[in-house]
Amino acid sequence: MNKSYCIKLFSEIFSDSASKYRFCCHANENDTTKKYNPLNTTPFDYFLSPEMEQIRNDVLSGKRIQGCEECYLKEDAGHESFREQYNQGKDLPTNVESYNVDLKMHIFGTFCNLGCYMCIPFDSSTRRAELQKSGLKDFWYDMESADYTLEGPRNLGTKRYEEIEANLIANIDYIRILRFYGGEPIQMPRVWSLLSKIPKDKAKNIEVLISTNLTLTEFKGYSIEWIKERFKKLTLTVSVDHYGKKLHWIRYPINVFEFEKNLALYKKDVNYLNIAVSMLNVYDLKEIEQHYN
């Protein structure tokens, strides 16, 4: 395939915390598509729009597109880019295909039951409340490098979320993977609202990936086990920054015993442990690895 093609343009719908559609989490905005956002355009109306079709045609013809500068700069400097990593070893589609779309949208909320020290505040309601209470919110935002983070999280509102959810269900045959991240998805009502509305025969074709703190495994009659029984596959990416007393201090107010019990119970469903490296754990990384092995 040519040096501008990227599989993400054909297989991923991504929106960030500021309710902006982008080609992937590494991409900048594109002038032709930035008019679309989850507040005014449903996911598949954006993804199947004439503008997105033109962008896909452009990369198929070898044209570089606005928004993908980070990858192009890496490649021009002789380094491997995210684009090249994503394309590697994959069947590369040339159009939008059924059961091939990876949905990764920040539309389900930011509620989280922990206030982790390394957490970006727009990804955790608890951390955000703590920083606001302590007067450190502006200081934290000043440390962010991406412009979109300055805008903070946007609440879609119930009516708008229901419209988006209906659009996803209507186009469920396109979806291969549902990714839930930001906050604690297992404790978000909207996550379970979407999952429960997907017909059983369709769910069997869909993989679910959840980025979780794994402190809780159930929510109002739903559970991790319910997902495993209903969907094709469940994958858990588990956030963990230390162990024992240090874990409790960093990821306050985590119940370490319950967390490690859940981790052992769902070990086979975990693809990796996600560690936020900071001065609070950087000298203990080998020790942490040995503990969880």
Model-identified regions with their sequence ranges:
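Accessory C-terminal segments flanking Radical SAM cores
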Residues: 1-89, 101
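A Trp-anchored, charged/polar loop motif used as the substrate-binding/catalytic surface
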Residues: 49, 89-96, 157-169
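Short pre-active-site segment immediately N-terminal to redox-active cysteine/selenocysteine motifs
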Residues: 67, 75, 111-115, 122-123
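Short cysteine/histidine-rich metal-coordination sites, predominantly Zn2+-binding motifs
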Residues: 83-96, 133-138
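Core AdoMet radical
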Residues: 100-111, 120-160, 173-191, 201-221, ...
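A short acidic, amphipathic alpha-helical/loop segment
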Residues: 167, 190-197, 221-226, 249, ...
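Catalytic cores of alpha/beta
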Residues: 279-293
